[in-house]
């Protein structure tokens, strides 16, 4: 898909990248904590009901009249618009308490609490590397110590944990509602994003933005929620307040954003919880910037279907319809 082939920019502040942000990489030595907390006793991050669903602090029941809008259809009346706005406002009000700011060194990003023990989903480029000390800033400004755990750089999925499994009042940490196992996001679906754009601001809660799902693959969800630096690792919710993705990176425009879907975290959970690191971050591999025309039926040549604007192929003069008949002196 051409949209997914665009040049990309990691969203966390203090990390760098590409001339689009005009930023420079800053690296600061980190204090490494002792061993990360023991792995949870489950193969999924939370205790779930028989459907695999968990109703956390962000869950908002959906009126049957909203089922059509929930599935991605457009509002058709003023009544639809008001009902949609009301539902979005209810979810937005709950997102603040589970959206956190993550800090280590000069880098800041966002994250979301996903169980009572203080586990936090974020982006791999925010978590950095396993077993690093991190500060977790909660919705009310409290700062608590955390540690980075596993990072799947192939998909930009990261895991962090608050060191204490309960807060200072011995209460469990609030956490987001998670979808049922196998529940997938659909193109056109309405979504609600949270995060800390530009980093933590003491008198400002997590910033909420509304959008829709533009595209879905097994490893990426694309939305038009407007995101900028500092939002990386923040949560993306559906209209029921269920967590459906984690902010990863943007394309050329701030309303062309890629998120890591929940199935990636579920599939990688054991390795993430075991503080493993693997893969290469998206956007850091060499790319050509083309996709093949899948409708062409030939084994002797490859027909170019799309060319990413301003990518290496475009700069070399390759256009859709070109035929590749030889590569590296091989037919």
Where are these regions (language model features)?
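Flexible, gly/ser-rich surface segments that form the specificity/activation loops bordering the active-site cleft
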Residues: 171-220, 228, 250-258, 276-283
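Conserved PDZ fold ligand-binding element
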Residues: 117-121, 244, 313-331
């Amino acid at each position: 898909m051409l949209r997914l082939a665009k040049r990309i920019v990691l969203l966390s502040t203090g990390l760098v990248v590409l001339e689009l942000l005009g930023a420079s990489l800053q690296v600061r030595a980190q204090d490494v904590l002792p061993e990360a907390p023991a792995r949870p006793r489950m193969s999924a991050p939370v205790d779930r009901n028989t459907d695999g669903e968990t109703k956390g602090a962000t869950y908002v029941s959906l009126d049957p009249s909203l089922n059509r809008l929930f599935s991605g259809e457009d509002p058709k009346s003023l009544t639809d618009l008001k009902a949609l706005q009301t539902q979005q406002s209810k979810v937005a009000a709950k997102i603040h308490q589970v959206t956190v700011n993550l800090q280590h060194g000069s880098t800041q990003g966002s994250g979301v609490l996903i169980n009572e023990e203080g586990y936090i989903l974020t982006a791999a480029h925010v978590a950095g590397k396993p077993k690093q000390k991190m500060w977790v800033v909660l919705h009310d400004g409290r700062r608590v110590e955390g540690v980075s755990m596993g990072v799947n750089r192939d998909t930009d999925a990261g895991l962090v944990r608050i060191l204490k499994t309960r807060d200072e009042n011995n209460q469990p940490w609030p956490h987001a509602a998670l979808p049922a196992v196998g529940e997938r996001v659909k193109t056109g679906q309405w979504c609600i994003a949270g995060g800390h754009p530009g980093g933590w601001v003491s008198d400002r809660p997590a910033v909420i933005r509304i959008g829709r799902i533009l595209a879905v693959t097994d490893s990426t969800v694309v939305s038009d929620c407007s995101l900028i630096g500092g939002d990386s690792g923040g949560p993306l919710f559906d209209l029921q307040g269920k967590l459906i993705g984690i902010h990863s990176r943007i394309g050329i425009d701030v309303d062309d954003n890629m998120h890591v879907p929940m199935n990636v975290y579920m599939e990688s959970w054991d390795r993430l919880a075991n503080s493993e690191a693997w893969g290469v971050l998206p956007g850091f591999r060499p790319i050509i910037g083309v996709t093949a025309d899948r409708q062409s039926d030939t084994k002797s040549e490859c027909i170019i279907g799309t060319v990413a604007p301003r990518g290496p192929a475009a700069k070399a003069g390759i256009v859709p319809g070109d035929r590749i008949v030889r590569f590296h002196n091989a037919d």
